[in-house]
Amino acid sequence: MLCMNSPTSSTRSQSDVCIVGNGAIAKTAALGFAQAGHSVTLLAPPAAPGAADAAVTGTAEQPWDVRVYALNHTAHTLLSTLKVWGALDADRVAAVDSMVVNGDGARPGDLAFDAFGAHVGALAWIVEDRNLNQALDAALKFAPKVQIVHGRATGIASDDAGVTVQLEGGGSIASALLVGADGGQSWVRGQCDIGIDYRSYHQRAVVTNFSCEKPHHGVAHQWFTGAEGVVALLPLPGQRVSLVWSAPDALADTLMQETLSELAVRLGVLCEDKLGALRPLTPEMVKEVPLVLIRPHAMVAPRVALVGDAAHVVHPLAGHGMNLGFADVAELLATVAAREDQRSIGDARVLARYARARKEDVFLMQLATDGLARLFGTELEPLRVARNLGLNLLDKLPMIKRRLMAHAMGK
């Protein structure tokens, strides 16, 4: 791997694939294309001052990252194939053996899934953002066909011969394919004039970690509370859990103003102390993320493919935003690998196949998460009764439950 700052006005970089982004999805795409034999330029933002000093190694003594992902089997398979999964700090990865979804009201509904019923070893794996990115960075260091450029792009031009990204300072990166993996506010998407449907949920995800008095036994809990939003407690190694509270804006303001000890007490009451007393695990570390729905009108443009949040942003109540991104990367790699010999990796027909292959999966996940967010966000009593009855009914229909589990696991 070669790492450099933005090329100067006299520098024109050439590679098979240029990937814009600096998150786990961008790094996974870079690694995947490199391992498939393609030369790759990963265009990342300029490094922040002191970033190198902050990039400490993953140890048991390191504070637990409040940003975690519930990775499904598609993500696990892709990362294993790229030899990344084995590089994760296994002591900081927790398997989800079962999941319990709890309704609200006087007669709350319940829905339970477990790995045994799905005939798998785990439903998902909880991985910290830091742990994942450190493993990807380590793998990229040994990828000879990857060049990482730190700089800012200023424009994109594409033609039949390829696509060129112009850089601040006058340099450029030419490639056969440009991959936009630059997040929900994607610069690449905007440069390609791909419109979006945007809606705010007027909610924010409040995230932090706690230690718990009782063992969680690998169970992920989710509570649909109506007025207080959706609360998820995800298992971390040992007697630790990660909180993702999708709260209405007014409540999120209150939660962010409380001390973590006060938040722990509030959470214990809401969750009926299922895990016993909760104690702050990462002192003074709590973050919030605005929750929105973003539906781009296309996933591809001439010589350009979007992946991850650049291609779709969904409500986190199903925990599958990151998994959709990994599925995008897996599909793009497979589609490019299966192209006819005479076609370039950025050929319009190749990219159209990628977009078609991802359309249904993305649409269904957007439909499901948006529908659930709307259904469980209402306080109308008839709908509250109906949704709880629906949870109870679904729990008694094993065939449908198995299909839901298979889709959620990416199988």
Predicted regions mapped to residue ranges:
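N-terminal glycine-rich dinucleotide-binding loop that anchors FAD/FMN and/or NAD(P) in oxidoreductases
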Residues: T59-D89
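Glycine-rich FAD pyrophosphate-binding loop
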Residues: V20, A34-D65
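Conserved FAD-binding catalytic core of PHBH/FMO-like flavoproteins
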Residues: L79, T164, G171-S172, L178-R279, ...
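FAD/FMN-dependent oxidoreductases across multiple families
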Residues: D253-G346
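N-terminal Rossmann-fold NAD(P) dinucleotide-binding loop
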Residues: A26-K27
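Beta1/beta-strand and adjacent pyrophosphate-binding region of the FAD-binding site
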Residues: S10-G23
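C-terminal helical "tail/cap" subdomain of flavin- and related membrane-associated enzymes
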Residues: A334-K411
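Conserved N-terminal helical subregion
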Residues: R12-S13, G86-Q191, R199-V207
